[in-house]
UniProtKB/Swiss-Prot annotation:
Keywords, sorted A to Z: Lectin, Repeat
Name the record gives this protein: Jacalin-related lectin 18
Classification lineage: Eukaryota, Viridiplantae, Streptophyta, Embryophyta, Tracheophyta
Pfam families hit by this protein: Jacalin
Protein species of origin: Arabidopsis thaliana
Residues covered by the Jacalin-type lectin domain: 12-158, 161-303, 304-447, 454-597
Superkingdom to which the source organism belongs: Eukaryota
Length: 600
C-alpha cells in the first residue's frame, strides 16, 4: 500500500499525484488551490478503470466548474455531492491503481460527515493509495488523464473548528479557552445555592494535559468533577443545562455527555433548558461569560473520526458502501450453507438508500433486523466463519444501543469475530467478496450522536397558573397525584434516565386529602396515554384539571380526582410518554406530555 500522509500545518499544502508518474505527459492537468471547498465530483469509468473525472469547487460563495479530464466512454457514471452549506468538507481520498499499467481503477471520497461508496473497484492485486493530511481539507486537485485516469494528487488547507455561541447571559467577563486542543480531559464545577459559581476545564493535546483557568468565583457550595478518559477513545459530545430566564441569565445547572457515559446533573434544572451539541462532532474547547457566577457557556467542535473495522479470513474483491447517518434495516438471504446476499437499508439526509451484495441465484430470505433510527443504532456485529479452506461468513448477530439483540442469522461456525467500538454506532458496512460469497465483513463506526429530543404534545386545560416542564426522559417509573376539593392540586413524577432514577419537581401543593401513587413495572411497562377532564370551578377564573387516568401497555390506572367524563386524551400512536409539562397554580390548570417512538 502506498500512503501519503502529513502532519504539517502550512496554509496550503500540495500532495504529489499517486499512480503513474508522468510529469512530462501532455495529459497532465491542475485545477490549482484557489478555491474554498470542493462541492461536487463527477466520475465515469468501466471495468478497466476510471476514464473521466471532473471537480466542481466553491470560491467566495460562487460555484466554479472545471473541465472533464479524460474521454467520455460508455460505462458507469457516479457523482458525489459535498454540502458546504452544512459545513461539509472533503478531507481525504483513497483509491486503487493497477500496479502494471498504473491506471486508477477505484476511488473513495471522505468528508468530515460521511464516506462515499467505493466508485469503481479494488481487487486483491491492486495497489492502494491515500491522499490525506491530518486536520486539513482538500481545496483542489491535479493529476494526469490519458485514456484513463493515470494519477491523482490534491491541495490541502487547514480546517477551522466550529464555534457554537454561548447560551445564557453575556454579562461579566468574556472568557475563551480556545480550540487548540484534541479533547476535554476533566471538568470541575462549583455549585452554589441557586446557580453554578465557576467552571474549569482541563484539556489534552499531543497526549499532554493542559490545565485551564477557573471561570467565575469560588463561594460556599459544592464542587463536583467529571473525567473523560481520552486513552479509551472517550470524547465529550454534548452539554445540556439550564439558565435563568430572568434578568440574571446565569447558569443554574449543567450536565455533560461523552460517547460512553453521562454525568449527573450538576446544580438545578430550573429555568430555560439549553444544549450544546453537533451531530458527528466532539467538543475540543469552551468559551463564555463569567463574573461572580458562570453567566453563559459555549463550545468549539471538530469532526470526530470514523473508525473502520474489518474481519476477513480470505482474499477477494473489495466492496464498500461508505458511510451514512445510520442503519435502518439489515436483510439476510442465503443458500443452504453460505450467505449469498446481504441487503442494508441506510438513512442519508432523511432519505432511505439501499445497498446489497452477493450472488442472486437460488436465494431465500432468512430474516431481517429493523433498527429504530434515529433513536437506536447498531453498536456491534458478532459473527462466525465456515470451517473450510476458503472460509466465508457463516452467521451474524447484531446488537443495538437500546440493549436489543437480533436473532442469529445462519449456522454458527467455530471461528468467531466481533466488530465493535466503545461508545460508537455503525454507520456503514464494507468487506470482501470471494466467488460471489462474503468472505470478509467490516463496519464503519462513529460516535453515537445525542438522541433527538422527544416530541412535545400540546398541554390541555386552562390558561391559569405558571408554566412548568420536566422535559423528556427514557420512561416514567412512578406518578404521584395530590387531590384538592375540586380536582387535582399536586403532581410529581419519577423518571428513568440511563437506568437511573430522576426525581421530578413538585408541581402544586399537597392538601389534607392526601397523595395517591401509580407505579409502573419497569422495564416492561410503559405509559402510552393520559385521559383527563377540565372545567371552571368555584374560586378559579380559568379551567382546572378535574380528573386524570393513565393507560400503559399493560393496564389502565384508577381515576384520580373527580370521577367525570374524559374530555381529552394525550397520546401519539406508536409512541410512549417520557415526560410531562403543564401549568400550575393553587390547582393544576394544564397538563401535556413528551413522547418518544416505541421500540419493539
Amino acid at each position: 500500500m502506498s500512503q501519503v500522509f502529513s502532519n504539517l500545518f502550512q496554509m496550503t499544502q500540495r500532495l504529489e499525484a499517486q499512480g503513474q508518474k508522468t510529469l512530462d505527459s501532455p495529459f497532465v492537468w491542475d485545477d490549482g488551490s484557489d478555491h474554498d471547498d470542493v462541492t461536487k465530483i463527477h466520475v465515469r469509468g468501466d471495468s478497466r478503470g476510471i476514464n473521466c473525472i471532473r471537480f466542481d469547487y466553491i470560491k467566495s460563495g460562487q460555484r466554479k466548474y472545471k473541465s472533464f479530464y479524460g474521454p467520455s466512454w460508455a460505462g458507469f457514471t457516479q457523482t458525489f455531492k459535498i454540502n458546504h452549506k452544512e459545513d461539509e468538507q472533503l478531507e481525504s481520498v483513497e483509491g486503487f491503481y493497477k500496479p502494471d499499467s498504473r491506471t486508477i481503477v477505484g476511488l473513495q471520497f471522505k468528508t468530515n460527515l460521511r464516506i462515499s461508496e467505493l466508485i469503481g473497484h479494488g481487487k486483491k492485486d491492486d495497489t492502494k493509495f491515500s491522499l490525506a493530511v491530518d486536520g486539513k481539507k482538500i481545496i483542489g486537485f491535479h493529476g494526469c488523464s490519458g485514456s484513463y485516469l493515470e494519477s491523482l494528487g490534491a491541495y490541502f488547507t487547514c480546517i477551522a473548528p466550529t464555534r457554537m455561541e454561548a447560551k445564557g447571559a453575556k454579562g461579566g467577563t468574556d472568557w475563551n479557552d480556545g480550540a487548540d486542543h484534541e479533547g476535554v480531559a476533566k471538568i470541575y464545577v462549583r455549585g452554589g445555592r441557586d446557580c453554578i459559581q465557576y467552571i474549569k476545564f482541563d484539556y489534552v493535546k499531543d497526549r499532554k494535559y493542559i490545565y485551564g483557568p477557573a471561570h467565575g468565583v469560588r463561594g460556599r457550595g459544592f464542587t463536583e468533577s467529571f473525567e473523560i478518559n481520552h486513552l479509551d477513545n472517550e470524547y465529550m459530545v454534548s452539554v445540556e443545562g439550564y439558565y435563568d430566564e430572568g434578568d440574571s441569565g446565569i447558569i443554574q445547572g449543567i450536565q455533560f455527555r461523552t460517547n460512553i457515559k453521562t454525568s449527573e446533573l450538576i446544580g438545578y434544572n430550573n429555568g430555560k433548558k439549553f444544549s450544546l451539541a453537533a451531530n458527528g462532532k466532539k467538543i475540543i474547547g469552551f468559551h463564555g461569560y463569567a463574573d461572580q457566577n458562570l453567566n453563559s457557556l459555549g463550545a468549539y467542535f471538530t469532526t470526530s473520526p470514523f473508525i473502520k473495522l474489518e474481519s476477513r479470513e480470505s482474499t477477494g474483491d473489495l466492496w464498500d458502501d461508505g458511510t451514512f447517518e445510520g442503519v435502518r434495516k439489515v436483510c439476510i438471504h442465503k443458500q443452504p450453507v453460505l450467505y449469498s446476499v446481504i441487503q442494508f437499508e441506510y438513512v442519508n439526509r432523511g432519505e432511505v438508500e439501499n445497498r446489497d451484495l452477493g450472488l442472486r441465484v437460488f436465494i431465500a430470505e432468512e430474516g431481517e433486523f429493523v433498527v429504530n433510527y434515529p433513536y437506536e443504532f447498531i453498536i456491534s456485529v458478532e459473527g462466525t466463519f465456515t470451517n473450510e479452506k476458503d472460509p466465508h461468513v457463516a452467521s451474524l448477530t447484531f446488537k443495538t444501543s437500546k440493549g436489543r439483540t437480533s436473532s442469529t442469522f445462519g449456522t454458527p461456525g467455530t471461528k468467531k469475530f466481533v466488530l465493535q467500538s466503545k461508545g460508537c454506532g455503525v454507520v456503514g458496512f464494507h468487506g470482501v467478496l470471494s466467488n460471489d460469497y462474503i468472505s470478509g465483513l467490516g463496519a464503519y463506526f462513529r460516535l453515537l450522536p445525542p438522541l433527538p429530543d422527544g416530541e412535545k404534545v400540546e398541554a390541555k386545560g386552562g390558561d391559569g397558573g405558571a408554566s412548568w416542564d420536566d422535559g423528556g426522559f427514557d420512561c416514567i417509573r412512578k406518578i404521584y397525584i395530590g387531590h384538592g376539593e375540586m380536582g387535582i392540586a399536586f403532581v410529581k413524577f419519577l423518571y428513568d434516565k440511563d437506568n437511573k432514577f430522576v426525581v421530578g419537581d413538585d408541581h402544586g401543593s399537597k392538601t389534607l386529602l392526601g397523595v395517591d401513587e401509580f407505579e409502573l413495572e419497569h422495564p416492561d411497562e410503559y405509559l402510552i396515554s393520559v385521559e383527563g377532564s377540565y372545567d371552571v370551578v368555584d374560586g378559579s377564573e380559568s379551567e382546572v384539571i378535574l380528573m386524570l387516568r393513565f393507560k400503559t401497555n399493560m393496564r389502565t390506572s384508577q381515576v384520580f380526582g373527580l370521577d367525570t367524563t374524559s374530555s381529552f386524551i394525550l397520546e401519539k400512536e406508536c409512541h410512549k410518554i417520557v415526560g410531562f409539562h403543564g401549568k400550575i397554580g393553587k390547582m393544576l390548570h394544564q397538563i401535556g406530555v413528551h413522547v418518544l417512538p416505541i421500540i419493539d
